[in-house]
Amino acid sequence: MAAPAPGLISVFSSSQELGAALAQLVAQRAACCLAGARARFALGLSGGSLVSMLARELPAAVAPAGPASLARWTLGFCDERLVPFDHAESTYGLYRTHLLSRLPIPESQVITINPELPVEEAAEDYAKKLRQAFQGDSIPVFDLLILGVGPDGHTCSLFPDHPLLQEREKIVAPISDSPKPPPQRVTLTLPVLNAARTVIFVATGEGKAAVLKRILEDQEENPLPAALVQPHTGKLCWFLDEAAARLLTVPFEKHSTL
């Protein structure tokens, strides 16, 4: 079977340079969207190491645009663990503490799960909130989704060989058997990921090198979840550091301030 197009691959000499470039891209994408006909910017964030990276770089990158621009941002989360917001595993909780305290997006435009609901109801509730925020879209269309990828090839809470990879109707799905703790989560589904205008995968460190080679170069009969993210009309980009990219033989753009 033919391999899908890997998208634009950018490799940075360090995770610090990657983070700075990512923040600038978010700021530029926001400015472009806010200047357009819709005059809003919809951003979907993932957790993990992205929290500290964006917390370090994004406030300064978007500061020149001023708080009036942030008032037109809509922020959602690509997946979430079903834990209280003050729990160390809460993606929203970590962003609230480390980023949103310095990025004054109106609270009404930050779309979160209700962690007090059972996981199935939490997924339905989050889907309802997304549909309200994206009125006019048959499926929520994010201007920019920032995704991570696990050493096993998972992205969001979409894990290898899991039935959720076949989900085509729901925009948000519950998962109660995550192979990575905590087991109960809520995740965007592939139809939403592939409807986005721009998707950026971010991966750093040698621990990601082998799986990135599989995703970006191998022609697998049973593709890993991250390889199934192929935006229908949007752009797909990969931001990697040198350690994560060390096994790649496909063409990529090398970025360095040296």
From Swiss-Prot:
Q: What GO terms are given for molecular function? A: 6-phosphogluconolactonase activity
Q: Where in the cell is it found?
A: Cytoplasm
Modification N6-acetyllysine occurs at: 180
User: Per UniProt, which keywords does this protein have?
Assistant: Acetylation, Cytoplasm, Hydrolase, Phosphoprotein
Using the UniProt record, name the top-level EC class of this enzyme in a single word.
hydrolase
Q: Which residues carry this modification: Phosphoserine?
A: 49
Q: In which pathway does it act?
A: Carbohydrate degradation; pentose phosphate pathway; D-ribulose 5-phosphate from D-glucose 6-phosphate (oxidative stage): step 2/3
Query: Which reaction(s) does its UniProt entry say it catalyses?
Result: 6-phospho-D-glucono-1,5-lactone + H2O = 6-phospho-D-gluconate + H(+)
Return the similarity comment: Belongs to the glucosamine/galactosamine-6-phosphate isomerase family. 6-phosphogluconolactonase subfamily.
Q: What does this protein do?
A: Hydrolysis of 6-phosphogluconolactone to 6-phosphogluconate.
Q: What is this protein called?
A: 6-phosphogluconolactonase
Its taxonomic placement starts with: Eukaryota, Metazoa, Chordata, Craniata, Vertebrata
Its encoding gene is what?
Answer: PGLS
